[in-house]
């Protein structure tokens, strides 16, 4: 007579074998379509309307950087830098910080300018 098989042990082995092979093939990840940016068609030179807008609106901005001006007026960054230098030289905007890579301006208020003059006069 053949030896008895342990049915309890076989059932555990069978469960382990089923669990290991039960996953099947994993689904292949689909490549997502990359985000497409719209091409910026910014002005290289000022036209009359944009130049007027520069002198009217930009001095009233609280934070003035070449990137902000470029984005709002739809002009190139190099043109925005040159325009901000011009506005600063005319005293329409005030320099906050100057760095080789980033220049930050703010609106020139008459109150802050007079306070600076008074403080310098006091010292």
Curated annotation (Swiss-Prot):
Keyword annotations of the record: Ribonucleoprotein, Ribosomal protein
Any one Pfam family match given in the protein's UniProt record, by short name: Ribosomal_S25
UniProt key word RNA-binding: no
Residue stretches of biased makeup (Basic and acidic residues): 1-13
Domain of life (superkingdom): Eukaryota
One Gene Ontology CC term in the entry: ribosome
Keyword Ribonucleoprotein applies: yes
Biased composition (Basic residues): 25-34
Region annotated Disordered, chain positions: 1-34
Similarity comment text for this entry: Belongs to the eukaryotic ribosomal protein eS25 family.
Name the UniProt record assigns to this protein: Small ribosomal subunit protein eS25
Source organism per UniProt: Branchiostoma belcheri
């Amino acid at each position: 007579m053949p030896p008895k098989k342990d049915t309890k042990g076989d059932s555990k082995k069978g469960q382990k074998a089923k669990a290991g092979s039960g996953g099947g093939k994993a689904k292949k990840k689909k490549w997502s379509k990359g985000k497409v940016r719209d091409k910026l068609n910014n002005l290289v030179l000022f036209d009359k309307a944009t130049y007027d807008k520069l002198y009217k609106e930009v001095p009233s901005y609280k934070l003035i950087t070449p990137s902000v001006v470029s984005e709002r007026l739809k002009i190139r960054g190099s043109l925005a830098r040159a325009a901000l230098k011009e506005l600063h030289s005319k005293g329409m905007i005030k320099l906050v910080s100057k760095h080789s890579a980033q220049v930050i301006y703010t609106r020139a208020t008459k109150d802050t300018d007079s306070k600076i003059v008074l403080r310098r006069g006091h010292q």
